[in-house]
A protein has these predicted regions:
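Hydrophobic, aromatic-enriched alpha-helical segments typical of multi-pass transmembrane helices
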Residues: 1-230
Length: 230
């Protein structure tokens, strides 16, 4: 069990890295720089805070790299619970990583557009600003695809947590519910215009947030227990 506790702590540390860098990359930086209905303001914000924008990209790389390693550590911890579900968990999590990393090229392209390259002088200011916002929109579209797998992996992961006997069943339930929250938002985002502006999208995301932050802290602080927890 000492070995399991060590594995759990490593998983918790990786998960914490994913959570913190993910919040910075996906929430904090965009909230400071991007104004979706104003290309000019967005362009100038990125130009004036280029370092913050670059840090956001680096945070994304760290986040997705940690997320690539995380499921393999969890696999080692949860293999004893159910091998098939553990394998499925790894596959579904790992699929999202190349999608997410390749998608970061859209933000790298934004850096090219705000640069001082000679060839950019032939492009009008308005067109340049519109292209910056277009690449950011491309990035968001890529994140929608990646989010499908961010949700799917939570189902086998939550099931393994629920059945483990050494992790809280309640967190397993939240994780499994989070899967369906992700799927609902994925489908809603494609079928319903301005779905993201609806309050329901944030409410549906809550189980995943509670489950993931909860299991992250549990693994990091407590690790595993000898007896079943509720």
């Amino acid at each position: 069990m000492d070995s399991n506790k060590k594995t759990a702590r490593i998983a918790g540390l990786l998960y914490l890295t994913v959570v913190l860098t993910g919040i910075f990359h996906l929430m904090y930086v965009p909230s400071r720089l991007i104004v979706w209905d104003n290309a000019s303001v967005t362009f100038n914000n990125i130009l004036e805070s280029e370092t913050l924008f670059r840090l956001g990209i680096v945070a994304g790389i760290v986040c997705y790299t940690a997320f690539l390693i995380l499921p393999f550590v969890l696999y080692k911890l949860l293999l004893q619970v159910h091998k098939t579900f553990a394998i499925g968990m790894v596959i579904l999590a790992v699929i999202s990583v190349p999608i997410s990393l390749i998608n970061l090229l859209n933000k790298v392209n934004v850096l090219s557009l705000i640069g001082k390259a000679q060839y950019l002088q032939v492009i009008g200011t308005d067109e340049l600003q519109a292209q910056v916002l277009l690449y950011l929109d491309f990035y968001n579209n890529g994140m929608k695809i990646a989010s499908l797998f961010w949700g799917l992996w939570l189902l086998p992961f939550g099931y393994l947590v629920f059945k483990s006997g050494f992790l809280p069943k309640l967190l397993g339930i939240f994780l499994m519910a989070g899967c369906f929250g992700y799927l609902t938002n994925f489908v809603g985002g494609f079928l319903i215009p301005n779905y993201g502006d609806l309050g329901i999208s944030r409410m549906i995301s809550l189980p995943a947030s509670i489950g993931e932050i909860g299991i992250c802290l549990w693994l990091l602080i407590i690790g595993v227990r000898h007896k079943q927890t509720l």
